[in-house]
């Protein structure tokens, strides 16, 4: 009788459990910071409106149930009298389903606590209350037991939210001793919701911090990853890649290269993480490790999830690169290939601040921004571990400056050619004294140097290094460097001649000696600087930039071989102009105060003439180097320097009354010769006619 009652009780319990399971509907409610656990009790049902169709009242809300096999609801908000989808919690995943194939009794796990364990010969299934418990029980070594169920699920907003919380829980509870196998399974799960097809669904997740939580969870999990080899590719999924290597204070400069596609049809986008040598010296002698993770779609997901956030108005234009480094390392160099490579697609380097949950512009500094790629110097901290580039809002500014430069260079080249033609025409009439001779020698060489430099600059700006010869680009860079330096040194020599003319009155230097000094300064000094620069930097391939035919800055600072001489000469020439201005305002003996206006006009004229001839316009370049400089300085600098050839023609040639007089005399002489030629041609003909008439 006792055995019969026990058997009856067991049958009743089994029937009760099966009935409960058949009526059980799993539903999860995800909030920031919640743990994924088995739902207890019946899910709460909210107000559900069967249809959200037709006209509506503004700001009103509506909800509909999810499709079959999904639990949750879809929320709509009325906007302009139309229902628009605003939120979605439809999910087909649950903690139980993740492990249903791992044990036959997992479907009974929810009701298991109510089973009377003292019943003879009955073993209740072990309760799976959380993801951590399920993984520890079923797949503690590789986490592979959860991947198939996740990868087969549809990427609805509810499932995405579930998977984000799943990864967040794993990073929090199971991130000790992360192996390569665990990282692979973890990344497979993350890859599923990083797919381009899932991007639009991120916008409807109620928790707008889900994308930021995902990024932070991946970084936290990767921090505990152990690398066995010196360098290895750990994860190579379509939408997430992980690489790492061992480092110590004796390691040379290290870099990690990524090549990923936004989808299966587009070309790969490149990214590189570089740890400078000076940073590696900060490490202790014992080995450390550096890990980097690349995401091609996460930038779009972060933007999609924060469309209402005013701090994210611009599009991410490259990979999102996360790094996990030892605490002593603070500075890294990142290279991003642009997704949008149009000419006006300027970029801004940024880092993702995990606490503020927004892109932080102060985390990075721009090192290089060209059409195809961007190089950034970024500060790595515990709250800023992920970096990318945003589309800059200053694209129209750059477009305007490009137009100014293009038009200005064209006008400048034509003006310089005309200047040289005029100088050749009036040369014999204007070089009557040693001072005038050297003055025009300076103007001619300034014009020749600037004209040649502009031509080489145009050649270099249209030169494709990847498609054309490397050595040819080196030659273009060398000649551009040499002739721009020649321009500045000839302007320096002209300034020295002005000072010499003011200070030395009674003693004059021989013309031949002045010519030797002039050509030694004008061409000798630039040649020495240019040759020395290429000899020092080119053996290490650091003479020119990798993307353009111009002096390198990032690696060897070869650009200083142009910038330092140029700005020093501009400073010296500015002093000369001030000396001329002071000397001009000295009143002559017997002059009255009524001549003040005349003196001011004379000073203004001298300054206007000397400014382009002595290169003072390049001084505005200092202002443009300062971050946050007003657009006005950039436009002024572009105008003055692009049109420098025109100003040389205007102030150095046309406004010189001696040249104008010489041109008039030359024109009169040409007219006189043409009339004489006409008379000479008509003379014999008229004589023959008279002889014929007399005959």
UniProtKB/Swiss-Prot annotation:
Residues 249-397 form the GAIN-B domain. It holds the Pfam family 7tm_2. Residues 428-440, 507-515, 583-606, 656-695 are cytoplasmic. One of its GO terms (biological process) is adenylate cyclase-activating G protein-coupled receptor signaling pathway. GO terms for molecular function: G protein-coupled receptor activity. Residues 1-21 form the signal peptide. It is a multi-pass membrane protein. Residues 349-397 are annotated as: GPS. Orphan receptor. Most adhesion GPCRs undergo autoproteolysis at the GPS region of the GAIN-B domain. ADGRF2 is not autoproteolyzed at the GPS region because of the lack of a consensus catalytic triad sequence within the GAIN-B domain. Belongs to the G-protein coupled receptor 2 family. Adhesion G-protein coupled receptor (ADGR) subfamily. This is Adhesion G protein-coupled receptor F4.
């Amino acid at each position: 009788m006792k055995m019969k009652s026990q058997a009856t009780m067991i049958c009743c319990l089994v029937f009760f459990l099966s009935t409960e399971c058949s009526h059980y509907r799993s539903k999860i409610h995800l909030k920031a910071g919640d743990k994924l656990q088995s739902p207890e009790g019946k899910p709460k049902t909210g107000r559900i409106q069967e249809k959200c169709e037709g006209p509506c009242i503004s700001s009103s809300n509506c909800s509909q149930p999810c499709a079959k096999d999904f639990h949750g609801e879809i929320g709509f908000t009325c906007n302009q009298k139309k229902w628009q989808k605003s939120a979605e919690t439809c999910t087909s995943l649950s903690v139980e389903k993740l492990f249903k194939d791992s044990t036959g009794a997992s479907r009974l796990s929810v009701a298991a606590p109510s089973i009377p364990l003292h019943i003879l010969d009955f073993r209740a299934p072990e309760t799976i209350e959380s993801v951590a418990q399920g993984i520890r029980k079923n797949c503690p070594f590789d986490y592979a037991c959860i991947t198939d169920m996740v990868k087969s699920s549809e990427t609805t907003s509810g499932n995405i939210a579930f998977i984000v919380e799943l990864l967040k829980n794993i990073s929090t509870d199971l991130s000790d001793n992360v192996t390569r196998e665990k990282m692979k399974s973890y990344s497979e799960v993350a890859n599923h919701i990083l797919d381009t097809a899932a991007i639009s669904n991120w916008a409807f997740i109620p928790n707008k911090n889900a994308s930021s939580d995902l990024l932070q969870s991946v970084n936290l999990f990767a921090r505990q990853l152990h690398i066995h080899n010196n360098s290895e590719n750990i994860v190579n999924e379509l939408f997430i890649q992980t690489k790492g290597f061992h480092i110590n204070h004796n390691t040379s400069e290290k870099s990690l290269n990524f090549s990923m596609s936004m989808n299966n049809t587009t070309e790969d986008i490149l990214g590189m993480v570089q740890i400078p040598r000076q940073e590696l010296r900060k490490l202790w002698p014992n080995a450390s490790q550096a890990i980097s993770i690349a995401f091609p779609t996460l930038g779009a997901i972060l933007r999609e999830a924060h469309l209402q956030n005013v701090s994210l108005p611009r599009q991410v234009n490259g990979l999102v690169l996360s790094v996990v480094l030892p605490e002593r390392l603070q500075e890294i160099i990142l290279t991003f290939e642009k997704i949008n490579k149009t000419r006006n697609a300027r970029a801004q380097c940024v880092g993702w601040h995990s606490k503020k949950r927004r892109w932080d512009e102060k985390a990075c500094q721009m090192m290089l921004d060209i059409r195809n790629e961007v190089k950034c110097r970024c500060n790595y901290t515990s709250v800023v571990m992920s970096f990318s580039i945003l589309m800059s809002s200053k694209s129209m500014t750059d477009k305007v400056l490009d137009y100014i430069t293009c038009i200005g260079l064209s006008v400048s080249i034509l003006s310089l050619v005309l200047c040289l033609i005029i100088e050749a025409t009036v040369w014999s009439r204007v070089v009557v004294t040693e001072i005038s001779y050297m003055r025009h020698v300076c103007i001619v060489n300034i014009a020749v140097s600037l004209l040649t430099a502009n031509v080489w600059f145009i050649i270099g700006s249209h030169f494709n290094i990847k498609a054309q010869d490397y050595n040819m680009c080196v030659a273009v860079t060398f000649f551009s460097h040499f002739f721009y330096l020649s321009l500045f040194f000839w302007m320096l020599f002209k300034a020295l001649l002005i000072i010499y003319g003011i200070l030395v009155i009674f003693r004059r230097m021989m013309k031949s000696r002045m010519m030797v000094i002039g050509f030694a300064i004008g061409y000798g000094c630039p040649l020495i600087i240019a040759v020395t620069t290429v000899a020092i930097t080119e053996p290490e391939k650091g003479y020119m930039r990798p993307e353009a035919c111009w002096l390198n800055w990032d690696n060897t600072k070869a650009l200083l071989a142009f910038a330092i001489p140029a700005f020093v000469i501009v400073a010296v020439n500015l002093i000369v102009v001030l000396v001329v201005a002071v000397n001009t305002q000295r009143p002559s003996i017997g002059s009255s105060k009524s001549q003040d206006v005349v003196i001011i006009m004379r000073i203004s004229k001298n300054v206007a003439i000397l400014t382009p001839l002595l290169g003072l316009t390049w001084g505005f370049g200092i202002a443009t180097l300062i971050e946050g400089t007003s657009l006005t300085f950039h436009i002024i600098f572009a105008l003055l320097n692009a049109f420098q050839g025109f100003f040389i023609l205007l102030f150095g040639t046309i406004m010189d009354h001696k040249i104008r007089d010489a041109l008039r005399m030359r024109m009169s002489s040409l007219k006189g010769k043409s009339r004489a030629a006409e008379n000479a041609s008509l003379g014999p003909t008229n004589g023959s006619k008279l002889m014929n008439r007399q005959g």
